[in-house]
Amino acid sequence: MAFRTAIAQTNYDSVFEPAGGGRPAKLTIRLKVALNPLDPAAPWVAQPQNGQQPPTHIANNLAGVRKGPVVDYNGSPFPCRSWIANEWNAFKIRFKQMVEVGWNNQILLLPTDDDQDHRLTDEEFRQLVFNPRYPAYVACAIDIQLVAIGGVSHALIEVAHLDHSSPQNGKFRVWMNRLTDESNEFTTFHWQQWPDTTFRQITSAHEVGHWLRSLVSTYFEHIDAAYAATQPPAARAHAQYGHTETLRSAMMGDGSVATDHEAMPWLTRMVRHAHMSLGWTFVHRANFDAAMPEISARQRALFP
């Protein structure tokens, strides 16, 4: 059975490309994102599940902006203004760049023969080898495809522009449905549990991660959600971002590193592109480059 080249679903699309021409096999998640420049002067509460489109406004210049309060995840109001056309165009370009930079070139999936009843054929295995001196693997990537306002998308995200000429009420807490003009930049975190560590994260990349959900869930969870569920209610919000330094450093924690948790959307989709219910192992690109896994006996036999 051959690999499925493309899969289109309501959570995200994906494309598999076999190795060839000196490049490795590749699995790309294609997420269609509708970014909406939020109109702060219009009354609106984010309601992403009811099909309504948020109010939008783009001004030609600063004299034409509208102003008003926009609430963050905690329900706190922040003074905001509408976007200016050139600002909005620049934000969209940088959004795509930063999300892809944050996620790409980290996740590799290596095939194994654990699933003996549904293992890859020799011809399929060959499609995962771009150089016999390297173990077979699939490089994973995300491709953000921006769609027009009101267009069909996998993710609908409002983007508020903070009014930086007005005093701000602390830090606007974004979430997967609502970002700000600051979300394409790195955010730094410091925690007393790890006083010598600075955690850095591209906010928009983290929030897009929540959209890499399964068909039966509304969002992709933070890295330590299962552990957080075992903690007292008051501690859960903090704990879900990671109760160890390693977990906290993950993309779906407070950092930028892809772990086996972040690899799950690609892993579950690769199962559908192939016909193995098991047989894929996550390896981080940095670990692969530092200590290349051993080439399997099967690969040595296919490429003597």
What are these regions (language model features)?
Residues 1-10:
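Low-complexity, Ser/Thr/Pro-rich intrinsically disordered segments found in N-terminal tails, propeptides
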Residues 9-18, 235-242:
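Short, surface-exposed beta-strand/loop micro-motifs that present aromatic residues
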Residues 13-30, 36-143:
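Zn2+-dependent metallopeptidase catalytic core
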Residues 26-42, 53-81, 153-198, 248-254:
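Active-site scaffold of zinc-dependent metalloenzymes
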Residues 44-53, 173-177, 262-273:
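Short, polar loop/linker segments at the starts of domains and inter-domain junctions
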Residues 45, 84, 104, 176, ...:
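Short linear interaction motif-like sites in intrinsically disordered regions of transcription factors
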Residues 92-236:
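Metzincin-family zinc-dependent endopeptidase catalytic domain
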Residues 190-297, 301-304:
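The catalytic-center signature of Zn2+-dependent metalloproteases
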